[in-house]
Design a protein with these regions (language model features):
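Short glycine-/aliphatic-rich beta-strand segments at the starts of folded cytosolic domains
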Residues: 13-27
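FNR-like FAD-binding dehydrogenase module
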Residues: 15-19, 36-37, 42, 86-89, ...
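Short amphipathic alpha-helix segments
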Residues: 29-49, 80
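One-carbon transfer enzymes
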Residues: 5, 53-301
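Intrinsically disordered, low-complexity terminal tails and inter-domain linkers enriched
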Residues: 3-14
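Short, surface-exposed ligand-recognition loops at beta-strand->loop->(often short) alpha-helix junctions
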Residues: 24-35, 70-71, 106
């Protein structure tokens, strides 16, 4: 998501061409694109991709620019500062080659975790997964197969237990800090996060819901869909918020089904959709293609 100030990223040696990603959002008015591209021209930037959107609902303007330049990060920041001030922009600047450090949380169902770990290894997702966290031990062998550390953080329903939800979330916060995490992915993690943790992770936590939201929220959505005789099932990747399954949607996919298929068939087909949908959302987020527009998102896919 875009940030109020330019986000930190390493500065390359002066003179070396380096790829950067710039995102911005502000109230729409004339002259924004001209001002931004002019500032980039001042640091010898060669723009390789540029996308923009003017929201008719909020009146905000959104822009994402990829460019290469020999300028240092400090030079770019200095060139953009007057533009940011003039238009009151929320702006982010990143190293395009830097992989996003991602903590994956899971429970017992490993298909989405496996997809993320495989794509990380294959180089098709611009993320680095330094740790997998789970409230169960079932998926430890899967993480070990990919050489990724697995940390068991059990969650007890007893608030007085050493494994209480409060204690588990405190442990999660420690791990986020320890591993310098930029993104948290709930890959079928079957625990509801506290409102406080959801607020703290706003814009940096993605969940996959095994339903085409806003239909069939909560548990066993495929069985709900089967009972209603739907002809399409799907999956929704969204940002985590305190309102369960109500966060801004990043990506959705659907799969056709028929009356002849059982609820178990729905589940099997749905798993494939979940994996691809979550991976797409993670990819877009890690490439800084997702910006908040009220309760919605702008996705420069």
């Amino acid at each position: 998501m875009d940030t109020a100030a330019l986000s930190p990223s390493p500065s390359p040696a002066s003179g070396a061409e380096h790829a950067r990603v710039l995102t911005l959002a502000c109230t729409n008015r004339k002259g924004i694109v001209h001002a931004v591209t002019g500032a980039l021209l001042g640091v010898e930037a060669d723009i390789t991709e540029s996308q923009q959107y003017d929201s008719p609902d909020t009146g905000d303007f959104f822009m994402r620019v990829e460019f290469v330049t020999p300028a240092t990060r400090e030079d770019i920041d200095q060139a953009l500062a007057p533009v940011r001030e003039e238009f009151g922009m929320r702006m982010g600047l990143w190293d395009a080659a830097q992989r996003m450090r991602t903590l994956v949380m899971c429970s017992k169902d490993g298909h989405t975790l496996n997809d993320l770990l495989f794509q990380q290894r294959a180089g098709t997702l611009p993320i680095e997964i330094p740790v997998v966290v789970s409230n169960h031990l079932d998926l430890q062998p899967l993480a070990s197969f990919y050489g990724v550390p697995f940390i068991h953080v059990p969650v007890s329903k007893d608030p007085s237990s050493r494994d209480s939800k409060e204690a588990a979330e405190a442990r999660l916060r420690d791990l986020i800090a320890q591993f310098d995490i930029e993104l948290v992915v709930l890959a079928r993690y079957m625990q509801i996060l506290s409102d406080e943790l959801c607020r703290d992770l706003a814009g940096m936590a993605i969940n996959i819901h095994h339903s085409f939201l806003p239909s069939f929220k909560g548990a066993r959505p495929y069985h709900q869909a089967h009972e209603r005789g739907v002809k399409l099932i799907g999956a929704t990747a969204h940002y985590v918020t305190a309102d369960l399954d109500e966060g801004p949607i990043i990506a959705q996919s659907v799969q056709p089904v028929t009356h002849a298929q059982t609820a178990a068939d729905f589940v099997a087909r749905g798993r494939d959709v979940e994996g691809s949908t979550l991976a797409q959302a993670v990819r877009w987020h890690a490439q800084h293609r997702v910006l908040a527009d009220g309760r919605r998102t702008v996705v420069f896919s």
